[in-house]
């Protein structure tokens, strides 16, 4: 093992070289202070490897590299060339899919099957934005015969990006794709719980033809490296995915520093509403997927299931049966649906919420306990007999815990659905088109799924209302986060006076 790379063999037999350093200006380097931190395998609570920790000085170095690239030759690279680079990066992700999926299962604990889905989604996202690179156009605006007016969509500059641990590589692609397509440079910080896949992805940056300094990948802690990014006077924009609590601090830091542009994709407490006329088999399947997918570690998880009175008892019985069928265990087993939570901290936090629900008088219909004795595994948990004001029904738990609540009619469903401070997503299950449209229009949520849940597609915008964020990820709308509009007025006529 060197200081900058380690040979790792994952439990499914994949052997690869894992970068450990900070990827700055096209090379892996040690941190300025020589600090490292361990990343933990959540399946067995044992260290995997130690990676270099970025400090404020390292952030300064990465930002300087990004600024140099942005002000230098990168600005002369044509949009079509940028697009080809992203497409090449997508190809490399697909080439190394088995390695990348294995890293995610090892470092994050997600099912290897689900991890392969993440890699495919990340590659697709990069390829999608590669296609957009040469299709971002301004307008000509006709005001009179003596003036030519037009607009240009120009890159913002150096972008700081802070990504979460629940979808490490997918979020890496969500952030990198639109930023590079529009001609920006990037300093991206991986989550301290899951740095490995982002560092491996950095290792193929040069192979994709992306010049040194354009993408810089650092590992470190939010309170140090993340804070340095948020406060940095030479970062023009910051993008963050994570908790609403941290999102507030980033917004404050941006305001206190250089008023950098900010996009935030934050928490949720999303309602998944099931009406009497719903196809119950379909609704049960999507409700189960909506909350227990990715171990409940989804910002848009359908963590509040609202069921109309006429089918409530039947739905509860069926949901209990379905939740018990979810295989919890080894993420490298192909039939595993739910692996461990990502960390001891997250495990403890979820168990505290479960205990709070019990103490508040909610009924544990399924689960409510630790799964096994090793690793951060939690049983799929279903609470009934809940009220809207309960803590477990108001705060984001971010784990395999769902509440099920009864409602009377459309108005009641809308009222309960909108009764939290969040507004990221919602689901509606009904055969009535009028009901679906009426309720989807009334819910204050950035994404509404009808007769499905958790189907995020990179061509479609994603983001929240209320305290669930600012701006949109994905689709063409994400490009707006990484460009600024310049208006040019060209006088064609004679002098004004």
Curated annotation (Swiss-Prot):
GO terms for biological process: ethanol catabolic process. The record marks 166 as: Transition state stabilizer. It comes from Aspergillus niger. This is Aldehyde dehydrogenase. NAD(+) binds at residues 242-247. The keyword Oxidoreductase applies. It catalyses: an aldehyde + NAD(+) + H2O = a carboxylate + NADH + 2 H(+). Belongs to the aldehyde dehydrogenase family. It is an enzyme of class 1 (oxidoreductase). The active site is at residues 265, 299.
């Amino acid at each position: 093992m060197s200081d900058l790379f380690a040979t790792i063999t994952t439990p499914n037999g994949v052997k690869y070289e894992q970068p450990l350093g900070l990827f700055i200006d096209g090379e892996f380097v040690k941190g300025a202070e020589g600090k490292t931190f361990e990343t933990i395998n959540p399946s067995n609570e044992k260290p995997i490897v130690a990676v270099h920790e970025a400090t404020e000085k390292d952030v300064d170095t990465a930002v300087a590299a990004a600024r140099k690239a942005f002000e230098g030759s990168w600005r002369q690279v044509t949009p079509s060339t940028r697009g080809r680079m992203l497409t090449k990066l997508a190809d490399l992700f697909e080439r190394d899919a088995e390695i990348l999926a294995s890293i995610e299962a090892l470092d994050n604990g997600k099912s290897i099957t689900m991890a392969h889905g993440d890699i495919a989604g990340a590659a697709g996202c990069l390829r999608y934005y590669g296609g957009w690179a040469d299709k971002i156009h301004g307008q000509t605006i006709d005001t009179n015969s003596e003036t030519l007016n037009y607009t240009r969509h120009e890159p913002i500059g150096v972008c700081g990006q802070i990504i979460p641990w629940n979808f490490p590589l997918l979020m890496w692609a969500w952030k990198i794709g639109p930023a590079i397509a529009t001609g920006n440079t990037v300093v991206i910080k991986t989550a301290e719980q899951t740095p490995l896949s982002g560092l491996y992805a950095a290792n193929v940056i040069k192979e994709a033809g992306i010049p040194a300094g354009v993408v810089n990948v650092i590992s470190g802690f939010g309170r140090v490296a993340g804070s340095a990014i948020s406060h940095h006077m030479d970062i023009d924009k910051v993008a963050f995915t994570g908790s609403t609590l941290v999102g507030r601090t980033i917004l404050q830091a941006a305001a206190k520093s250089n008023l950098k542009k900010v996009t935030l994709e934050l928490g949720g407490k999303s309602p998944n509403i099931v009406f009497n006329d719903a196809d119950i088999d379909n609704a049960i399947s999507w409700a189960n997927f909506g909350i227990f997918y990715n171990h409940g570690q989804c910002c848009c998880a359908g963590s509040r299931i609202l069921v109309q009175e006429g089918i409530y008892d039947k739905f509860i019985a069926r949901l209990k049966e379905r939740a018990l069928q979810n295989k919890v265990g080894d993420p490298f087993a192909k039939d595993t649906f739910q692996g461990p939570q990502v960390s001891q901290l997250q495990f403890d936090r979820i168990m505290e919420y479960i205990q709070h629900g019990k103490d508040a008088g909610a009924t544990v219909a399924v689960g409510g306990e630790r799964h096994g004795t090793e690793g951060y595994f939690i049983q799929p948990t279903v609470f009934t007999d809940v009220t809207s004001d309960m803590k477990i029904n108001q705060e984001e738990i971010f784990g395999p815990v769902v509440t099920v609540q009864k409602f009377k009619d459309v108005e009641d469903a809308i009222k309960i659905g909108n009764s939290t401070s969040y507004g990221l997503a919602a689901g509606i299950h009904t055969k009535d088109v009028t009901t679906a449209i009426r309720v989807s229009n009334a819910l204050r949520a950035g994404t509404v799924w009808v007769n499905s849940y958790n189907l995020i597609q990179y061509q479609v915008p994603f983001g929240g209302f209320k305290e669930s964020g600012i701006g949109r990820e994905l689709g063409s709308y994400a490009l707006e986060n990484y460009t600024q509009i310049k208006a040019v007025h060209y006088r064609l006529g004679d002098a004004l006076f």
